[in-house]
Each structure stands twice: as structure tokens, then as C-alpha cells.
Regions:
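ABC transporter nucleotide-binding domains
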Residues: 1-66, 70-73, 79
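Functionally constrained cores in energy, signaling, and assembly domains
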Residues: 2, 13-18, 26-27, 50, ...
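Residues that scaffold the ATP/ADP-binding catalytic core of kinase and kinase-like folds
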Residues: 18, 108-109, 156, 160
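Short, surface-exposed beta-strand/loop "edge" segments at domain boundaries and coil↔beta transitions
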Residues: 26-27, 31, 105-109, 133-138
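Generic structural signal for individual residues within well-ordered alpha-helical segments
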Residues: 41, 93, 154-157
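ABC transporter nucleotide-binding domain
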Residues: 44-131
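C-terminal coupling/interaction segments
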Residues: 121-168
């Protein structure tokens, strides 16, 4: 009986029902709980194949953000009952950065005024930043030895929920 199944097997049964329903809106709430890495990968592969054959809205809630980052088109982040991000993955990747360089250079960036460094190594600092970067800051970044790298979705999520979305 269903009640005697392990948590992972219950997840598989629920996922099969969700995928096979082909409903116009399909909701998966933590669909990989109890699944090992191989079964999680298999679920994502089957989900993507199903979506390609039958495009529809799939809502997926997960704490394993790094596993779904390449599968999603839109992201909604809810923190303390409020939506703090609702945007396409493309737009989010254009606003999520690691900014690193010499402390004296980074202090001149307007976009970092109300933030604190994520890491410091002597005179070097690394910031996590989510938001738009103005033209003056971009020109300044290009003229100095400041590194600008795209932040992954998981780090962006942690940054925004940990810091209360202060710098947006």
C-alpha cells in the first residue's frame, strides 16, 4: 500500500501522477524529497522531456536551487510572506553579481554604498550584489581592476533572503 512506501517512493509516485496528468498548470512541491542524486536527475530529465512534448506552466518549489537553475525560465522568491523577486532567469542573471577588488576601489562604487562585503582578504573584498549597476559604476569597474562575475541563483537567493533585500 502507499502508506508503506518510503518517502522517496512516495515522491516518485506523486511525480509520476503530476507529469502524466499533462495539466495546463502542474505544481510540484519539493518533488525530490527522499530521492537520491540519480533519481533526482532522472526526475528533472523526465520533467523536461514532458514539458518539451507538452508545453505548460510548471510551478516547482525546491530548496535544491542549484539543481533546477538550468531548467527554469522564471523565478519567484518569497521571503517572510512577501514576493521579493519575480522575474525571468535571464533578467536575474543580468542583475546578480559577485563584485571583487581592492577595498579602496570598491568603496567608490555607488551601487555598493549600503552593502557590506561578503568576504574580505586583507585589502581585497568580495560583495554579493543584486540590482542594476549604473553607467558611472560600469565605467569605473571597466577602468580599474574590479572583477564582475555573474552570481549563481542559489547564492543570489541566500543573499537576498539573508540580508532582507536591502540593496534592491
Amino acid at each position: 500500500s502507499y502508506r508503506k512506501l518510503s518517502r522517496g517512493m512516495k515522491s516518485i509516485v506523486s511525480n509520476i501522477i503530476g507529469i502524466c496528468s499533462n495539466a495546463s498548470i502542474t505544481i510540484f512541491d519539493e518533488p525530490t524529497i527522499g530521492l537520491d542524486a540519480d533519481n533526482r536527475n532522472e526526475f528533472y530529465k523526465i520533467l523536461l522531456d514532458s514539458y518539451i512534448k507538452n508545453p505548460r506552466t510548471i510551478i516547482l518549489s525546491t530548496h535544491l536551487i542549484n539543481e533546477v537553475e538550468n531548467l527554469i525560465e522564471n523565478v519567484v522568491i518569497i521571503h517572510k510572506g512577501k514576493v521579493i523577486v519575480d522575474d525571468s532567469i535571464d533578467n536575474i542573471s543580468q542583475k546578480s553579481f559577485y563584485i571583487s577588488g581592492d577595498k579602496s576601489d570598491l568603496e567608490k562604487l555607488k551601487c555598493l554604498k549600503n552593502t557590506t562585503p561578503d568576504k574580505s582578504f586583507g585589502s581585497k573584498q568580495v560583495y554579493k550584489y543584486y540590482g542594476d549597476i549604473n553607467e558611472d559604476d560600469l565605467k569605473f569597474i571597466e577602468s580599474l581592476n574590479i572583477n564582475l562575475e555573474t552570481m549563481n541563483l542559489q547564492d543570489m537567493f541566500v543573499h537576498l533572503t539573508k540580508r532582507g533585500n536591502k540593496n534592491e
